[in-house]
Amino acid sequence: MYKIQPMTLMENRSAAIPEPREVTTKPRRSDQIFRAVVTIGGMSSLVILGLIALFLSIKGFNVLRVEQLSFITESKWEVLQDGEGKITESTFGLAAMLIGTFLSALIAVIIGVPIAVLSALYLTFYARGSVKKLLVSLIDLMAAFPSLLFGFWGFIVLMASAEYWAKLLNKYLGFIPLFDVPAPIFTRSPFIAGVVLAIMIIPIVTAISREIFDQTPLDRIQAAYALGASKLAMIRAVVIPYGRGGVVGGAMLGLGRAMGETVAVYTVLNVVYQINWQVLFGAGGNVASLILLKFGEAGPQE
C-alpha cells in the first residue's frame, strides 16, 4: 500500500493560487461600438454649438460693421422708413438692455443664492422624515415651473409688496445713487424683476447645493464631531469648504438662467431704451425681453 504524504503549507498555497491570465488591451466589439456612439454624441453637441455661433456671427456682421462700438455703448433703437417702406436710417444700441440684464441678474443672485444655500443646509442636516421628503419634492417641482407662471405671479401678487419694500429702501438708502429715483415710480422696476428672478433660481441652486452637501465625506463629519464640534461648527469647518465649488457652480447656473430669462422679466419690467442705474426706478429692460418685443416686427437688420 502507498502512503499518502500530507501537503506542506507552501504546496497548499501554490495549489490554491490560480494560473495568471494573459492581460490584453484589445477592447471588445461592444466597447468599441459604445465608445463610437458616445464620441459621436459629444462631438455633435460641439458641432451644433459651433454652427449656431457661426450663424449668429454671419447675421450680425453687417450690423456690427455699420454700428461698430456704438452697438454696445449707445441705447437708441430706431428704424426710419420712407413712404415705400424702405429703411432710410437705422440706429441700434444695446447699452440700456445690457445694463438692465446685469442689474436684474445681480439682484437675483444677491437675494436668491444665500436663501438657496441655507435651504440646502437645512434639508441636508436638519430636516427629517416626511418633512424633508415634502420639501424636497416641492423644491424639485418649483424648478420645473414655466417662467410664465412666475411672471404672472410677480405681476399680480408680488408687485404690490415689492413696491412697499422699494419705497422703504428709497426712504432710508436714497442717498446712495443706486437706490435713488428721479421720479416716484416704483412699479415694474429692475428691483421687482430681480426679486422674481431670485424666486426662480432658488429651486435650481437649492437642488444643486443639496446634492453637493450630501456628498460630504462621512469620516470628515464624524471627525469633526469627535473633536467636540457642534453641528454649526461642523458645517462651517467641513461642509462649506467641501461644497464651495459646487455652490459656485450652482450659482453660475442660476445666474445664467436669470440673465437669459424672457417672459418673466417682460411681464414685470418696462422695456425703455434708456440707461438706468437706479434699481428702484420703473424703467429698464433686458436683452431677452427686447428680442421677445421685436420678434414679430423685426426687419432684416434687427
Positions of predicted regions on the chain:
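Transmembrane alpha-helical segments of polytopic membrane transport and secretion proteins
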Residues: 1-42
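Membrane-interfacial helix termini and adjacent extracytoplasmic/periplasmic loops
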Residues: 66-95, 150-199, 281
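Residue-level signal for discrete positions within transmembrane alpha-helices
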Residues: 97, 101, 137-140, 144, ...
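Transmembrane alpha-helices
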Residues: 145, 205-209, 216, 225, ...
